[in-house]
Amino acid sequence: MPRNPLKKEYWADVVDGFKPATSPAFENEKESTTFVTELTSKTDSAFPLSSKDSPGINQTTNDITSSDRFRRNEDTEQEDINNTNLSKDLSVRHLLTLAVGGAIGTGLYVNTGAALSTGGPASLVIDWVIISTCLFTVINSLGELSAAFPVVGGFNVYSMRFIEPSFAFAVNLNYLAQWLVLLPLELVAASITIKYWNDKINSDAWVAIFYATIALANMLDVKSFGETEFVLSMIKILSIIGFTILGIVLSCGGGPHGGYIGGKYWHDPGAFVGHSSGTQFKGLCSVFVTAAFSYSGIEMTAVSAAESKNPRETIPKAAKRTFWLITASYVTILTLIGCLVPSNDPRLLNGSSSVDAASSPLVIAIENGGIKGLPSLMNAIILIAVVSVANSAVYACSRCMVAMAHIGNLPKFLNRVDKRGRPMNAILLTLFFGLLSFVAASDKQAEVFTWLSALSGLSTIFCWMAINLSHIRFRQAMKVQERSLDELPFISQTGVKGSWYGFIVLFLVLIASFWTSLFPLGGSGASAESFFEGYLSFPILIVCYVGHKLYTRNWTLMVKLEDMDLDTGRKQVDLTLRREEMRIERETLAKRSFVTRFLHFWC
């Protein structure tokens, strides 16, 4: 009979990234890997239950010895990772560029065109800003959990541990499907982008070239992979900076065609699309899911937790910096797009598919400016962007498979890691699914990917809601078990209230998506086809949840707060020493300039 993951005893026997110690793979890895065998739950409590932040409990003081300090400094990496076999070579810049690689792609360069045509320039800015505020709470929640529990797969584990196994299985499987579909989708997008220069060569030939390149990149060790993604992401960041400067110049009338543009297109054809307030509001609501999808991948910082050098410091830094970088990029670019491209421009809908760079508002903006040569350069950048996203998709998908295999949601052979720290079985399975990209030459490829994307269309929203709910439940358990927040290496800036805000707003986005999917914009009534294209992932989520319940025969709705394991996988912390460190840090920071304090808080 399988052990119950709702009980503390289950997590007490979990090591190596929360892999059951009884699994056959664990015994094999024992011979080739050095790992900690003393788990916090098998020794004395890792954290003193008394604290000034825990009312009603007597304060106790632990003696701090030189050996304590030595262990704290020298064994950080070993304790941080809880000895997963994955290579631990990713730094802050690697984590940041991995997230950028996953989040800045067709969502920004291409899909924003359809969103502009559907909702108008005001809808673009409003929706992306609202989603950004939710994302800020998600990033903070994720930073707190990942710093405390830097395990392989990150949030894939948190929802199972802090919410409920069936819920975790459904959300994780949906999230995994998103990355599985994204790989072939981006490869097809790359082949379509090539048609801008040459449409005579068979698309599958280009798919084969890109497929082989991505497969090779993911066969490298994780550090080499991180450096590859760093270069690709830097190209995207530089292109965004370049377009921002160019967009400002064009908007002010500095292009070859001359003439001040400013907010001209906000007045004609208008800030919103539609002739009535109801139609305009529906257009606004229909863009929300596009906004959320475009940000998907920013949670990659937590997926990489088990492969970073010092996750308790790097994860919060990378998460916050990633948020500001991606949010600033999107909001700035979208504002400029709204000024340079009218929402009724027919080219926004002329693409052969949702990933056709011909409908990119950035390319259209440059063409409208009359600058020769630059549209071709922007197309080349879009090509690099989609290849980068496909590269990140293999990484994210394989690590999610490892995490799900660790917690028993996928077959155990997927969690095996080779001597170079690569989860080869998971990578090969992901690449196998990528063979779907060879439908690029088919006339039905757009229809195929429309329905494949529908399988996980809302997965990003489900994932973010699960992260915020995990954080809420974690904090509730801390309170019930009378634990101190001083135990946490990083504390969310938005707190529990911020997590509730993000969860509620994302829930409202799901409701808005239900409405716009069932009653699509421009339709005469309810449309079953439109509904399943936009909302199919929700009934699939329910089926996965119920199916897991029936299979496991576990009818508990939530992990009990008093039973929640708050120790396993965390480093032993001396609260007295930690408080002294925090006091010194605050005093040192208080002497710094305002700019330094500002950057320290937000970045």
Swiss-Prot record:
Residues with the Phosphothreonine modification: T76
Membrane topology: Multi-pass membrane protein
Example GO BP: histidine transport
InterPro entries xref list: AA-permease/SLC12A_dom, Amino_acid_permease_CS, Amino_acid_permease_fungi, APC_YAT
Region annotated Disordered, chain positions: 45-78
Topological domain spans for side Extracellular: 117-121, 186-203, 256-279, 343-376, 443-451, 511-530
Record function comment: High-affinity permease for histidine.
The protein's name: Histidine permease
Gene: HIP1
